């Protein structure tokens, strides 16, 4: 009786689980016996969704980082033999008229608090420049208060995993924080890639003038925005070897014969890159 009950139980299990566990999916072909398994259908690339790496973002959106920037004349071969006054004097349009690259200076960037640089932070107890500094932006470069791009040299450290520090002043934006707010909101939107941002209180000591004061001048509040580059792709879990394009002109025209996928017969790389500059 027990044997009959056991056999009945086995038959019942085979029925419930579709005979999978009982080997009924085995098949023999050319003398080879295999057990067939169920496979998930391949995912169409059109159905793949972007997913940002949310763990990158600091949840304290009101925190302010204090930075100290000492600027000096650098090497002429690196376009850094200029004064701080010259760097802040010209707009992008001026540089285009002069047919020269944007002027730079050598910089020592240090991170700390309102009392000064802090031990363990970038640039602490250093005296040799660790970065280059130039203005950034296009139309905003005409403003009296400039935006700055600070590029930390290789092997000279980094800040929050970043070697390019973009400081935006937003002089023409009355509230001064809408750019930061927009990035904070983007963090919560699915399938939309964001960028790390932070408020920065910047102090600058100019050692390029004829009569340097030797003191740090308060430049006020800036928004630091993560540079979209190869490191960005890697840090956000994307393909760091992918092509990364930046629009040359921010506009909303479709250009259907030019802005197409690479496998489209109409794709012309030269025409495409008139609208988008390759950032790699």
Regions found by a protein language model. Name each.
Residues 3-25:
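Sec-dependent N-terminal signal peptides of Gram-positive bacterial secreted proteins and lipoproteins
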Residues 22-280:
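Phosphate/dinucleotide-binding and metal-coordinating scaffold of catalytic cores
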């Amino acid at each position: 009786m027990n044997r009959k009950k056991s056999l009945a139980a086995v038959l019942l299990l085979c029925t419930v689980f579709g005979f999978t566990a009982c080997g009924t999916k085995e098949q023999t072909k050319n003398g080879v016996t295999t057990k067939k398994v169920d496979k998930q259908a391949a995912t169409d690339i059109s159905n793949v969704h972007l997913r940002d790496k949310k763990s990158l973002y600091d949840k304290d959106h009101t925190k302010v980082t204090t930075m100290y920037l000492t600027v000096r004349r650098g090497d002429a071969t690196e376009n850094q033999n200029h004064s701080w006054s010259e760097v802040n004097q010209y707009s992008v349009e001026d540089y285009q008229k002069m047919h020269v690259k944007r002027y730079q200076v050598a910089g020592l960037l240090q991170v700390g608090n309102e009392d000064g640089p802090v031990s363990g932070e970038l640039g602490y107890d250093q005296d040799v420049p660790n970065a280059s500094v130039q203005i950034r932006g296009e139309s905003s470069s005409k403003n009296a208060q400039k935006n700055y791009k600070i590029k930390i040299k290789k092997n000279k450290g980094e800040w929050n995993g970043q070697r390019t520090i973009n400081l935006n002043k937003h002089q023409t934006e009355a509230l001064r924080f809408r750019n930061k707010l927009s990035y904070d909101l983007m963090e919560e939107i699915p399938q939309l890639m964001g960028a790390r941002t932070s408020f920065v209180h910047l102090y600058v000591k100019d050692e390029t003038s004829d009569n340097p004061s030797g003191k740090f001048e308060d430049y006020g509040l800036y928004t630091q925005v993560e540079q979209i580059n190869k490191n960005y792709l890697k840090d956000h879990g994307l393909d760091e070897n992918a092509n990364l394009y930046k629009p040359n002109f921010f506009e909303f025209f479709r250009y259907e014969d030019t802005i197409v996928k690479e496998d489209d017969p109409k794709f012309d790389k030269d025409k495409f890159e008139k609208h988008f500059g390759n950032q790699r």
